Amino acid sequence: MGFSFHKVTLKKRFPLAISRGVRYDSENLFVRYEKDGYVGWGEGAPGETEGASTADEIQTVLKQFIATGIEGFSIQELYDRASEMRISPCAYAALDTAFWDWKAKKANLPLRQLLGFSRPHTPTSVTIGINSPEVVKNRVPLLLEGTTVQSLKIKLGSPQGIEADKAMFEQVVESTKTYDVKLRVDANGGWDVSQAQHMMKWLAERKVDYIEQPLKEGEEDGLKTLYNGRALPIYVDESCRFSHNIPAFAPY
């Protein structure tokens, strides 16, 4: 059994601005896991709110976890242990994916089939970051032209406030009129409860599919208020790091 780590810088086609800042590229960590003549690969993307803000930090976290002894444990047992040890989710994702990729290759099966998924392809989306209406007008065609993309995720939660969010969104609606795409919104925790209530109603009137992470991680109590009388389905992202986080959201 052996591991190796490889840092790769991925340049973004366009800068991605969200409520917490702007990213121009991402230095991700690829994990290579070899055992019994088979090789599995996994990838970890660092994040400041995910417990490992650089590829080097991901590598350090994973080396420390591996050093605790992982031989003889199932993938699920290792996942549970990582959760109990509060291992950074973005770091452990690289190791977990490498294990599953290795298992699929050993079984001579596509990973999707090993996991019980029948479809070889699934619809995906592209994302447009927080921008001025002028930038949105030019960028939407560049993102959608000549693709089979079915959904556009729109980053809101602008530091300039909800009026800036509305202006951007209105331009997105205008710029997507000639494309058959659904619109989703991700605020990345950029709103408070009052702003989220207002924006969810406003966005629902404009046929948005759902809202993702309206409130900051750590402000989950406010989700109960949003859930009551909600105008849109609510998805959580930053608030849900491991599978054991899911039951807390079951009541709403």
Summary of predicted features, one role per range:
Residues 1-50:
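Structured beta-strand/loop patches that form or line metal/cofactor-binding pockets in enzymes
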Residues 23, 88-96, 132-137:
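Glycine-rich anion/phosphate-binding loops
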Residues 31, 37, 95, 108, ...:
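Conserved, mostly hydrophobic/aromatic
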Residues 33-35, 39-106:
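Metal- or metallocofactor-binding catalytic centers and their adjacent structured scaffolds
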Residues 40, 183-185, 234-235:
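Residue-level marker for buried hydrophobic side chains located in beta-strands
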Residues 44, 97, 102, 187, ...:
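Generic detector of well-ordered alpha-helical packing
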Residues 113-230:
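Metal-dependent enolase-superfamily TIM-barrel catalytic cores that perform enediolate-based chemistry
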Residues 218-252:
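Catalytic alpha/beta core domains of metabolic enzymes, predominantly
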